[in-house]
A protein has these predicted regions:
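Structural core segment of the AMP-binding/adenylate-forming
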Residues: 72, 93-96, 100-170, 280, ...
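Conserved pre-ATP/AMP-binding loop-to-beta segment of ANL
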Residues: 38-40, 154, 172-194, 201, ...
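Conserved AMP-binding/adenylation subdomain of ANL enzymes
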Residues: 213-235, 240-282, 297
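Conserved ATP/PPi-binding loop(s) of AMP-dependent carboxylate-activating enzymes
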Residues: 364-367, 378-410, 448
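Conserved AMP-binding A3 loop
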Residues: 52-57, 190-217
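Conserved structural elements of the adenylate-forming
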Residues: 63-65, 173, 205-226, 291-295
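AMP-binding/adenylate-forming catalytic core of the ANL superfamily
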Residues: 115-119, 127-132, 284, 392-394, ...
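Gly/Ser/Thr-rich phosphate-binding loop
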Residues: 254, 281-286, 295-356, 369
């Protein structure tokens, strides 16, 4: 997608979108590579250490069988198919079959509880669901309240014998490996991904098939001109998150690059390093939360034979401390990128094209018009704080919030999609993130973003993780409060509170240091690894 270029400005001037009128994700990422050559698509490692390899030929045949089974069960174009599985071959097969059928995939996190599942299944009116026995245990009590959910496919030998439940392998064995994919337009719906729900009920972001093409420039830029030097791509991010699905799995397969799948019941930094070394991972997307946990692993480059060529990170601000650690521990410069479920991968760093600026996310990815605007959607001059926004139309931009026209209207101001984040842009095009609209702290007339304070706290040897919020104060409107998870061997006493306050005060500014500090065992996180600051403010 990105043309060859030796610098960012050259790349920007030469880029042009090439989105065909007719386009299908399943055909693009699977069928075009299934030529009988046995080209490797997926390496799957189970929790027990068993490893299997899946080719594009395998994927085509099995996804065709599943598409035929779905059609036999009455699924049609536009119907929603929920996918409630962790990383693995069947998850990918379900996505491919849904796209080829012209249906709409609805990925769901395996960590979701009953309420989260029921809301999404009811809101999307999913007609079919693909899961395993553990997943179906959560679904079974809900089915009476989900009249649209007609058919459940269950993977594994322990699939329950229940009405409306089909055993996945048995159903597929009865079908033909030949299937004629739906002739979809690039603008036809393909995918609903629900937002994290950090500011209210989750909203279903409906994406068209073109969303994959819209992601490619950002993936290629954040991954050092991907697929250059790419042999194997991995992320711990669940494929139910836009970061796992559209930052890794589908873009990698668009380029014919194999992907590594491995489910972690609980992410472990040591195990992550061992996994990457064992399989020779060259490219990785590692969210900041994963990087913070990996930072606790001693001397990884000395202990593991890493083959990394590129690492990208996004979802939360990275910070200078993690960036510096990455250069030493991973042997690469971590490229930070920015986006959201509705409009992803629109800003990025790329060490191959330009040096990152401290505190900046990066520059607009070619093809995406990013600006800082006011509440009316009018672009603001460099250096003026405002709302980070993306001009429409844009191939990566969502179509609408599923059955929520009011929320869709509120997402835009004039020609711009409002991300809900505040920031600034400088004359060189670098965008700096200040915070979510509702995360910015107002204290004694100052507007304070939590990111730099959290980054500063992480440089203290006692701190493993930190989150900063504003809490009401009668004199200052708000004061800065930090919630801190300590590294082993440190005690959260008054002396450490004072040490951390001095640590921030002497490195940032007097008005930015945390006047209150609470030591906690863990931080509240969304299923995608983002800090839920609202929960901390309410604590």
């Amino acid at each position: 997608m990105l043309p060859a270029a030796d610098c960012y400005d050259n790349l920007l001037s030469r880029f042009a979108w090439d989105v065909p009128a007719r386009y299908n994700i399943g055909v693009d990422v699977c069928d075009k590579w299934a030529d009988g050559s046995g080209r490797l698509a997926l390496i799957h490692e189970t929790a027990q250490g068993d490893v299997s390899r899946v080719t594009f030929d395998d994927l085509r045949n099995v996804s065709n069988r599943f598409a035929n089974s779905l059609a036999r069960a009455g699924l049609q174009r536009g119907d929603r198919i929920a996918i409630f599985l962790a990383q693995g071959p069947e998850t990918a097969i379900a996505h491919l079959a849904a796209y080829k059928l012209g249906a709409i995939a609805v990925p769901l996190f395996t960590l979701f509880g009953a309420d989260a599942l029921e809301y999404r299944l009811e809101n999307s009116e999913a007609a079919a669901l693909v899961t395993d026995a553990a997943g179906y245990e959560k679904i079974a009590p809900l089915r009476a309240r989900l009249p649209a959910l007609r058919t459940c496919y269950c993977i594994g030998d322990d699939a329950p014998d229940a009405p409306g439940v089909l055993r996945f392998d048995t159903a597929l064995a009865a079908e033909s490996p030949d299937f004629v994919p739906a002739d979809t337009a690039a603008d036809d719906p393909a995918l609903i991904i629900y937002t994290s729900g950090t500011t209210g009920k989750p909203k279903g972001a409906l994406h068209a098939h073109r969303v994959l093409l819209g992601h490619l420039p950002g993936v290629e830029m954040s991954q050092q001109c991907f697929p250059r030097d790419a042999r194997l791509f991995w992320t711990p991010a669940d494929w139910a998150w836009i970061g796992g699905l559209l930052d890794v799995l589908l873009p990698s397969w668009h380029h014919g690059v194999p992907v590594l799948a491995r489910r972690f019941e609980k992410f472990d930094g040591e195990a992550a390093f061992a996994l990457m070394a064992r399989h020779g991972v060259t490219h990785a997307f590692l969210p900041p939360t994963a990087l913070k946990l990996m930072r606790a692993v001693p001397a990884p480059r000395e202990r593991y034979a890493l083959a990394l060529k590129s690492v990208a990170s996004g979802g939360e601000t990275l910070g200078t401390e993690l960036t510096a650690w990455g250069r030493d521990a991973l042997g690469v410069t971590i490229n930070e990128f920015y986006g959201q479920t509705e409009c992803n991968m629109v800003l990025s760093s790329c060490a191959a094209l330009f040096d990152a600026q401290p505190g900046a996310i990066g520059k607009p990815v070619p093809g995406h018009a990013v600006a800082i605007v006011d509440e009316q959607g009018t672009p603001l001059p460099p250096g003026v704080e405002g709302r980070i926004a993306v001009r429409r139309p844009d191939p990566v931009m969502f179509v609408e919030y599923w059955r929520n026209p009011a929320a869709t209207r509120d997402k835009f101001a004039g020609d711009y999609l409002l991300t809900g984040d505040t920031g600034t842009i400088d004359t060189d095009g670098f965008v700096r993130f200040v915070g979510r609209d509702d995360d910015v702290i107002t204290s004694a007339g100052y507007r304070i973003g939590p990111g730099p304070i959290e980054d500063c706290l992480l440089t203290h040897p006692a701190v493993r993780m930190a989150a900063v919020v504003g809490v009401p104060d009668p004199t200052r409107t708000e004061i800065v409060k930090a919630f801190v998870v300590l590294n082993p061997g440190h005690v959260g006493d008054d002396a450490l509170v004072q040490a951390l306050q001095a640590h921030v005060r002497t490195r940032l500014a007097a008005h930015e240091y945390p006047r209150a500090i609470a030591f906690v065992d863990a931080l509240p996180m969304t299923a995608t690894g983002k800090i839920v600051r609202r929960a901390l403010r309410d604590a």
